[in-house]
Amino acid sequence: MTDSTTHDREMSAWQTHDHLDDPVIGELRNRFGPEAFSVQPTRTGMPVVWVKREQLLEVMAFLRQLPKPYVMLFDLHGMDERLRTHRQGLPAADFSVFYHLISIDRNRDIMLKVALAEQDLHLPTVTRLFPNANWYERETFDLFGITFDGHPHLTRLLMPRTWQGHPLRKDYPARATEFDPFELTRQKQDLEMESLKFRPEEWGMQRGTANEDFMFLNLGPNHPSSHGAFRIVLQLDGEDIVDCVPDIGYHHRGAEKMGERQSWHSYIPYTDRIEYLGGCVNEMPYVLAVEKLAGIEVPERVKVIRVMLSELFRINSHLLYISTFIQDVGAMTPVFFAFTDRQKIYDIVEAVTGFRMHPAWFRIGGVAHDLPKGWDRLLREFLEWMPKRLDSYVKAALHNSILKGRSIGVAAYGAKDALAWGTTGAGLRATGIAFDVRKWRPYSGYENFEFEVPTASNGDCYDRVMLKVEEIRQSLRILQQCLKNMPEGPFKADHPLTTPPPKERTLQHIDTLINHFLQVSWGPVMPANESFQMVEATKGINSYYLTSDGGTMSYRTRIRTPSYAHLQQIPSVIRGCLVSDLIVYLGSIDFVMSDVDR
């Protein structure tokens, strides 16, 4: 880490702030003048700057060229502003598009916003500055109907090509009951099948050269090595991959749209299913972002409990990843060993939360209930068991010469490429950048734990899988500290917006009982504002960007997932490799399609 973010961390997480003291605001004013843009106070923890459409490319290029540049486009998406009532001080807009940039050198973020009128939904593409903007712009076009001029291939991404309408617009229905009954006729079926045909010319690909013809191969969407409903079309010259086109969206469920029709509390179970292996890790950024809106500071016991559950799920996910990677390379046995170890984790999770994969256990202001008797014994037994088992995975499989031969030097990329494609997690740390949100931007008390951030230097498949092994060791260190230093105290915050409030108080205070009734029946009312929270999830950085319009439901829920960025990177990495290398590369990414498609 370079420039400290101590100032930001000392501020109350829920304090509305315009961040005018951030150095980048001064740099922008010096370059473009004080009247060139407006700054929006939010609870996102970063400067939010509205710029004119005509200045967008120039401003983004300027941020990339600063002495400590903003080198990563972390996120890009839109918002339908037409029904938003709390817009005081903001530029007039029917729609808006935001660009979230990260500077690794500064350890700081900035968000740029552009206001758009409904009759003129056009923006210049930023793909020439940030190549990973490609999918984000396609998705924004798909879900909002905003056109990005100059985009190399502006087509739908998550929805089928035959889809009518743009689902994240406010005038688009949110429930199936608002649509006419669906009927799949033979004609519709033929139309859908025709739309799935791959035409190389649409993607700028040649069918052949003067000397040879290329073969086009569909890998997926139901191939065992594609790790879910994921299709990737390969342009092949024999076994060599000339180019490829990833095709996503088969697992899309409209998770962000669902956030607009669920209360702040009732949306928690949906967060578990964004990345279905991460469990409570997925709940963390959502509840932290909501707590920023509400102004809730949770007790120390809650922070440590949340960290404990998150690290258990991190180990659980990493074990599945390591074993399936080994399986993709050709060894079967480790998968069965891993499921034995994962069962021990599920026993702890079930004892604590009552559920296994999808606990939906974190609450706004705390957790659902206190730790049960005997939780410490279960955790202690696991901590005694797991280190030796982890050593056996390394010795028996990961040090195997065949596995090394299939993965060392395969699908390698450097730090510059990783940042350009928005790569996070082990994929970024394998290139030598030790960016881990738990260390660089601690949340939920991670600053009180001692652990290391493992890194590597080759950026290949083998580095990525070995980093996950080391991350498990660090998670075990964190769990040891949770076991030894679990604070006493309540498991929920004493705050009016804690949902649901502590039950014992509802039996003693009529005000709390009324509050409980309103929160359960209608949902808590959050102050109008915007908040943001990123966490180090199992597969990289996961974040929630929430917009409240002062109601019981989110006005806009934006979910940024790591797997989405990692799959977009595939063509740039795998060109010139063999098909067999692609299988190993896919296994090394660590993704699930629910995390990609949401």
Swiss-Prot record:
It is a peripheral membrane protein. Gene3D superfamilies: Cytochrome-c3 Hydrogenase, chain B (1.10.645.10), NADH:ubiquinone oxidoreductase, 30kDa subunit (3.30.460.80). It is found in: Cell inner membrane. It catalyses: a quinone + NADH + 5 H(+)(in) = a quinol + NAD(+) + 4 H(+)(out). PROSITE patterns: COMPLEX1_49K (PS00535). NDH-1 shuttles electrons from NADH, via FMN and iron-sulfur (Fe-S) centers, to quinones in the respiratory chain. The immediate electron acceptor for the enzyme in this species is believed to be ubiquinone. Couples the redox reaction to proton translocation (for every two electrons transferred, four hydrogen ions are translocated across the cytoplasmic membrane), and thus conserves the redox energy in a proton gradient. Residues 1-189 are annotated as: NADH dehydrogenase I subunit C. Its main location: membrane. Keywords: Cell inner membrane, Cell membrane, Membrane, Multifunctional enzyme, NAD, Quinone, Translocase, Transport, Ubiquinone. This is NADH-quinone oxidoreductase subunit C/D. NDH-1 is composed of 13 different subunits. Subunits NuoB, CD, E, F, and G constitute the peripheral sector of the complex. GO terms for cellular component: NADH dehydrogenase complex; plasma membrane. Residues 213-598 are annotated as: NADH dehydrogenase I subunit D. InterPro entries: NADH_DH_suC, NADH_DH_suCD, NADH_Q_OxRdtase_suD, NADH_quin_OxRdtase_su_C/D-like, NADH_UbQ_OxRdtase_30kDa_su, NADH_UbQ_OxRdtase_49kDa_CS, NDH1_su_D/H, NiFe-Hase_large. It comes from Edwardsiella ictaluri (strain 93-146). The lineage of its organism: Bacteria, Pseudomonadati, Pseudomonadota, Gammaproteobacteria, Enterobacterales. Pfam families: Complex1_30kDa, Complex1_49kDa. NCBIfam families: NuoC_fam, NuoD, PRK06075.1, PRK11742.1. One of its GO terms (molecular function) is quinone binding. In the N-terminal section; belongs to the complex I 30 kDa subunit family. Its EC number is 7.1.1.-.
